[in-house]
Amino acid sequence: MNTGGGQYTDFPAVETHGGQFISYDIFGSLFEITSKYRPPIIPIGRGAYGIVCSVLDTETNELVAMKKIANAFDNHMDAKRTLREIKLLRHLDHENIIAIRDVVPPPLRRQFSDVYISTELMDTDLHQIIRSNQSLSEEHCQYFLYQLLRGLKYIHSANIIHRDLKPSNLLLNANCDLKICDFGLARPTSENDFMTEYVVTRWYRAPELLLNSSDYTAAIDVWSVGCIFMELMNRKPLFPGKDHVHQMRLLTELLGTPTESDLGFTHNEDAKRYIRQLPNFPRQPLAKLFSHVNPMAIDLVDRMLTFDPNRRITVEQALNHQYLAKLHDPNDEPICQKPFSFEFEQQPLDEEQIKEMIYQEAIALNPTYG
């Protein structure tokens, strides 16, 4: 999240519901939150879902990022995604994962249509940094990689696959602390039906996902980490595919056309046929192409960008790699004590049920509003 977005301007504020809520007019968009939140209120981001502002939580005296998801229940998939994200963030507790602070209850239960979620406030994200002209030392890049793997170790230990790791989902603050966000696409590690509801950003997508393999594993996140780290070192995306086919082409041109033994992981005959008709590219030596990158870093990336997910390095193994030796501390890389349960998604949920479940999350965090 980038705070470059706004400076505090006086937004009209009106107390509502007997002073329990305050309604702000942010550039014509209504922002109605509980009265513990006070100015300065600063718009810091805009997305397809709505608007994000930083605002002061007077109970903790902390500035938080407040995201408004307007008409959150209009689209069934989006509503499920919001519920999933809230439940996941409430379950996860780790220094390298964005912490949820609040789900604001609606003033009137029967008129519940917008969802407000507050999280820790961060200064920027990795996408902004990569695109900026801010210089990054190798130590910076190494430290970002270490924190990303440290957070991912915890996520995978909770039986969760993130599925959408990319630079804009890695938030940073001025101390170079990195926190993983955006769990709306996360999935259980042991689930076989392929979720097509959202398009994961193509550039960071593992080959098994490009090939529509339905039994993908946590290894897809490791592939994304390899792509992100190389983008950090080169200041440009490693595989900026224009479409599915182009993406696969870029992968094979750099990493070589997969051999028969690389394809053992997929039972999809169409995928195998597609690979077999590709031109036969040899694997390019990454160390030669990226001679400015530490050879030990290249060795680690090589192990992350391995075609066969069964042979790809795991997060735990990556943390143990020599390149991260001076940061790695096995006593300070915690795992999640309790696996996350995706059970709430097993039964088909209608709009009202999702609304009720999000309402219950809000009330759990704000018992006096129940």
Curated annotation (Swiss-Prot):
Q: Which CDD domains would you find in this protein's record?
A: STKc_TEY_MAPK
Q: Give the source species.
A: Arabidopsis thaliana (Mouse-ear cress)
Q: What induces it?
A: By touch, cold, salinity stress and ozone.
User: Self-association or partners: how does it assemble?
Assistant: Interacts with DSPTP1B/MKP2, NDPK2 and VIP1. The interaction with DSPTP1B/MKP2 is repressed by fungal elicitation. Binds to LIP5. Interacts with VQ4. Interacts with RACK1A, RACK1B and RACK1C. Interacts with FLZ9. Interacts with MKK5.
Residues in coiled coil: none
- PTM entry text: Dually phosphorylated on Thr-196 and Tyr-198, which activates the enzyme. Dephosphorylated by DSPTP1B/MKP2.
Looking at the record, the residues that make up the Protein kinase domain are 38-324
Looking up SMART domains in the UniProt record yields:
S_TKc
From the UniProt record, list the reaction(s) this protein catalyses.
L-seryl-[protein] + ATP = O-phospho-L-seryl-[protein] + ADP + H(+); L-threonyl-[protein] + ATP = O-phospho-L-threonyl-[protein] + ADP + H(+)
Q: How is its activity regulated?
A: Activated by threonine and tyrosine phosphorylation. Activated by MAP kinase kinases MKK4, MKK5, MKK7 and MKK9. Activated in response to hydrogen peroxide, ozone, salt stress and flagellin bacterial elicitor. Triggered by Agrobacterium upon T-DNA transfer. Repressed by DSPTP1B/MKP2-mediated dephosphorylation.
Positions carrying Phosphotyrosine: 198
| Localization per record | Cytoplasm; Nucleus; Cytoplasm, Cell cortex
Q: What is the lineage of its organism?
A: Eukaryota, Viridiplantae, Streptophyta, Embryophyta, Tracheophyta
What's the name of the protein?
Mitogen-activated protein kinase 3
A GO MF annotation of the entry reads: protein kinase activity
Q: Where does ATP bind?
A: 44-52, 67
